[in-house]
Amino acid sequence: MENVKHIILVLSGKGGVGKSSVTTQLALSLHETPFYSRKLRIGVLDIDLTGPSIPRMFGMDAETHRIHQSSSGWVPVYTDETKEIGLMSLAFLLSSKNDSVVWRGPKKAAMIRQFVSDVNWGDIDYLLIDTPPGTSDEHLTIVESLLSVTSERPQLIDGAVMVTTPQNVATLDVKKEINFCQNLKIPILGVVENMSGFVCPHCSDCTNIFSKGGGEQLSNTYHLPFLGAVPIDPKFGELIESQSTEHPLIEHYKQLEVAKLFQKITQNMLDSLFHSPSLVLDKVLSGHRGRIWSVAVHPTLPLVATASEDKSVRVFQAQTGELIHVIDGYHTRSVRRVAWRPIDRPVLAIASFDATVSIYEKIDDDWECVAALEGHENEVKCVAWSHDGVYLATCSRDKSVWIWEAMEDDEFDCLAVLQEHTQDVKVVAWHPKDDLLVSGSYDNTIRFWRDDGDDWVQTCELTSHTSTVWALNFSPDGRLLASGDGEGEVFIWEKLVSNEDAARTPSTNILRPSLEEEWCLKAVLPRTFTEPVYTLGWKDDHTLCASGAEGTIGLFAYEDDVSTWHTVSLKEKAHDVYEINTIAWTNDSRLLSGGDDGLCNVWKLSEADQTA
């Protein structure tokens, strides 16, 4: 059990409400949920000893599929050769499926304890435990047994899902299950109302053959999440009865309409499990007369800057949203990017489509242009300061990356012009703790740059993207790099140990072997976007925000395994019908987003995030 990440009980107060059906569909939906970055490994433990249904639900004949013993314990029965869904049930141990189980409580308890102690699940993401009706020995035994082997887990059981039908006779018994969980301090993830209507197999209309809404009413009474209502779908029943090796449940289930319902139910359950936050609009920073291209938060001072195609930059007080100053009149074309120098006074680098970069500083009560950087032959697309404010990087449509050093008396010295990209360079970003620069381009590549003492050289090139790299952002600890592209993909990269072998690259910059580094693709975020991702922002080392052309803000996170990310929250139409070009986090965990509507929205996370 030590390699089981999450344990969820599925409970019902009364038999015949379709609890095993719900368990089966939760397992199938979790396995392929789009809210994770990969297919999940699922285990299903059937502790309904006298009436085990899980083998039949998955089409695994209990007389031909048997439990095997290995040196590390009992091996689950897997639904296919991928071994991504494993099953454990007493039915796999009985000599005949017609055998009755006439056991007293102590023998039942011993069997359940053996399931907990002897089954080798391997590394699985979720273990769903299908329980018998009521609150009896089996329920107490599974909880006590899990406690004895999972004492190091921060939470004994991650939660329980309640299954009921709409009728009062069913919801009455579920109330007892709720009390059971509350007495044992088991979190209740929510209620599923099963058999909520009947779907006609001919016209697909849904008719209420029982009462409706009992499960939702129960949720409201006990202030529990209502996960969703599931109608009786004859097509699902037909699939269960007709499945075979040639027509496995796992392949055909996803084509059913009920599968779409369970994807939503599964996401609601995950939201409850992870205390998923929602974005709530706090205030709006306005005043620009064109789209906002960039928003930047000062690292230490309560200042926010927004840059717009109206050729201006507006500076706001971060907490109140009060307009402090408007910087305009210098640039002759759209201002594409703005960046605060990470020092304890207000200094801004402003990049423009007029091919120049201006440096503004607040001196006394006014904002003055203290330097102008020229040299790019075309639009400057991005500007970024190094972690200590010593270096400034700029990139342009002219395919080049320039590195400047900030000198005394507001002077800037151009240290390098990097011309290895073959197309428009869209973005540059610095490592938060090291003098490492990355750049992303219309040529679909990400390139890494370091100072080798004589010149700035390319130390790594990543070519996994198949479209324009629009966004790059390092995690606050510098361990991970996120990249977003023109096809809506977001990649997560992690640095490997540097390779001391001699570098072989066609680059004009000669690379010393000791500087060569390798970054490995660790994850692709859950596929949320189909249009370009323009902007990325880390809330913390484990939580990343992404947005772009679709106008949806996505919040994603991982727990312990950096290769496994899940969707935390989605905010659709965050700027109505407009694209979002930029996001940034404030020091008090508010999110800023700037869009084509010319507005900078300030979002607060719901309180639930504080316990996630």
UniProtKB/Swiss-Prot annotation:
Residues involved in [4Fe-4S] cluster binding: C200, C203
Stored SUPFAM superfamilies: P-loop containing nucleoside triphosphate hydrolases, WD40 repeat-like
Entries under InterPro entries matching the protein: CIAO1/Cia1 (IPR028608), Mrp-like_CS (IPR000808), Mrp/NBP35_ATP-bd (IPR019591), NUBP2/Cfd1_eukaryotes (IPR028600), P-loop_NTPase (IPR027417), WD40/YVTN_repeat-like_dom_sf (IPR015943), WD40_repeat_dom_sf (IPR036322), WD40_rpt (IPR001680)
Gene3D superfamilies: P-loop containing nucleotide triphosphate hydrolases (3.40.50.300), YVTN repeat-like/Quinoprotein amine dehydrogenase (2.130.10.10)
Keywords: 4Fe-4S, ATP-binding, Cytoplasm, Iron, Iron-sulfur, Metal-binding, Nucleotide-binding, Nucleus, Repeat, WD repeat
Positions annotated as WD repeat: 287-326, 330-370, 375-414, 420-459, 464-503, 528-566, 574-612
GO aspect biological process, one term: iron-sulfur cluster assembly
Top-rank taxon, per record: Eukaryota
GO molecular function: 4 iron, 4 sulfur cluster binding; ATP binding; ATP-dependent FeS chaperone activity; iron-sulfur cluster binding; metal ion binding
Localization of this protein: Cytoplasm; Nucleus
Cofactor: [4Fe-4S] cluster
Record text on cofactor binding: Binds 4 [4Fe-4S] clusters per heterotetramer. Contains two stable clusters in the N-termini of nbp35 and two labile, bridging clusters between subunits of the nbp35-SJAG_02895 heterotetramer.
Keyword Metal-binding: yes
Family: In the N-terminal section; belongs to the Mrp/NBP35 ATP-binding proteins family. NUBP2/CFD1 subfamily.
Role according to the record: Fusion protein of two essential components of the cytosolic iron-sulfur (Fe/S) protein assembly (CIA) machinery. Required for maturation of extramitochondrial Fe-S proteins. May form a heterotetramer with nubp35, functioning as a Fe-S scaffold complex, mediating the de novo assembly of an Fe-S cluster and its transfer to target apoproteins.
Complex formation: Heterotetramer of 2 nbp35 and 2 SJAG_02895 chains.
Protein name stated in the entry: Probable cytosolic Fe-S cluster assembly factor SJAG_02895
Species of origin: Schizosaccharomyces japonicus (strain yFS275 / FY16936) (Fission yeast)
Lineage: Eukaryota, Fungi, Dikarya, Ascomycota, Taphrinomycotina
